[in-house]
């Protein structure tokens, strides 16, 4: 499998790196198209979790969600490694976009804020109704929203996604953007994603000047928030 992967793809550059994963920009040698390769290794539990999530979202077909082209296992020397091949988005994160547009006295128009907000709501409508059960993203934030070179919104990073009917409690998400129930480990619900989109809209309206919850973990924040639902 290791040789087959490298026979098909040329690694262009490393995009990011963490303890158990590396993300690369790669080029398909035959099709001559760029894609993203996410390679996870060194932790069997994490690899199994990510593989399960990849299978959860592999059949999603929506213009604002990156396509998953392939899922491979054991591409390296580590038998627990997996690789997810995804659509490459040539663009910038919403956080970078807002910073660029509002820097040096610039302005993000109401029309643009509404356009991005509507596209995010269209994504949620699709995800929450997918296959009758729905899929919850559970980590919507400016860093997980991309705008391609044409300005089209793309929602990325489904690492925390769960099936809508799973009835699972969640303690994941990003401070400031996670809904109150995520802080206290309650059941995942569609409203959690809606809350996060609302916080993203606030981020745009305030031109990125909203306070974060740095220094606070999810478990320590419930006392500072009232339940909204």
Give residue spans per PLM region.
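Conserved activation segment of eukaryotic-like protein kinases, specifically the C-terminal portion
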Residues: 168-182
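AlphaC helix of the eukaryotic protein kinase fold
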Residues: 41-59
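Conserved catalytic-loop aspartate of Hanks-type protein kinases
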Residues: 193
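Protein kinase catalytic-loop region centered on the HRD/HxD motif
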Residues: 121-135
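Conserved short submotifs of the Hanks-type protein kinase catalytic core
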Residues: 77-93, 97
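Activation-segment/catalytic-loop signature of the eukaryotic protein kinase fold
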Residues: 71
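Activation segment signature within eukaryotic-like protein kinase domains
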Residues: 116-117
């Amino acid at each position: 499998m290791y040789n087959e992967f490298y026979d098909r793809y040329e690694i262009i550059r490393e995009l990011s790196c963490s303890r158990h994963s590396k993300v690369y920009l790669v080029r398909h040698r035959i099709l001559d198209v760029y894609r993203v390769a996410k390679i996870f290794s060194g932790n069997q539990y994490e690899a199994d979790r990510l593989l399960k999530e990849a299978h959860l979202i592999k059949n999603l077909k929506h213009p604002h969600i990156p396509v998953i082209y392939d899922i491979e296992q054991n591409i390296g020397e580590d038998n627990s490694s997996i690789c997810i091949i995804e659509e490459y988005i040539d663009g910038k994160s919403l956080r970078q976009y807002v910073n660029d547009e509002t820097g040096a006295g610039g302005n993000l128009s109401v029309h643009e804020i509404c356009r991005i907000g509507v596209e995010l709501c269209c994504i949620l409508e699709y995800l929450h109704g997918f296959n009758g059960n729905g899929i919850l993203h559970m980590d919507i934030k400016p860093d997980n929203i991309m705008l391609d070179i044409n300005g089209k919104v793309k929602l990325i990073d489904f690492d925390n996604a769960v099936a809508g009917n799973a009835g699972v409690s969640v303690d994941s998400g990003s401070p400031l953007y996670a809904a109150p129930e995520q802080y206290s480990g309650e059941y995942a619900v569609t409203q959690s994603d809606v809350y996060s989109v609302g916080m993203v809209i606030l981020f745009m309206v305030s031109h990125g000047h909203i306070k974060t919850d740095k220094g606070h973990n999810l478990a320590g924040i419930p006392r500072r928030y009232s339940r909204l639902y």
